């Protein structure tokens, strides 16, 4: 099928709703046949229904949408690419592993899978690396703004950040959401936009600094990452109030 990742997402949601419908449909079956539901009826019927709908209806629709998306991305000018890169980068920091983060990541993975273009992967990877790196930076240079426990935890975010594990920032974001998330969004958006401005690309779905050897224009990717990290780290450091030990 040429439906691409959008069609795959639609198929997943469709399969879930069909299973819910089938459970209601067969609710009145004799209990002696209860064991057939999960091992025979649900899998076979849902596969048949989803497959039929995908082949005749959903597949062609999303194939056209996917083709339009590919053409749009191919014809996108630098200004639009920078804006989209900034949006994707910022989304990675909004909820740090939640729906916005996963939506940006899934979109970039889909574009990479369908077109082989890893430019948006560079944007989301930079955006996802910045929250933990910015926290690590802030806890290092603004010690009076964090407790002893936070400073110790902040050190581990250096490793988490370079590994593209955004979730390392969640404990800090939970305790101070406005300052941590707000600062991280700004830094991640700047970094995401810069990756597109400087035409960087990472043809890998994960890995952080450990896949930098695969990147196109890796030096510029690192510069974008550094700029975003410094901006977010400084915002966190100056925005937070000193803590009383």
Model-derived regions, located:
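Pore-lining transmembrane helices
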Residues: 1-31, 35-243
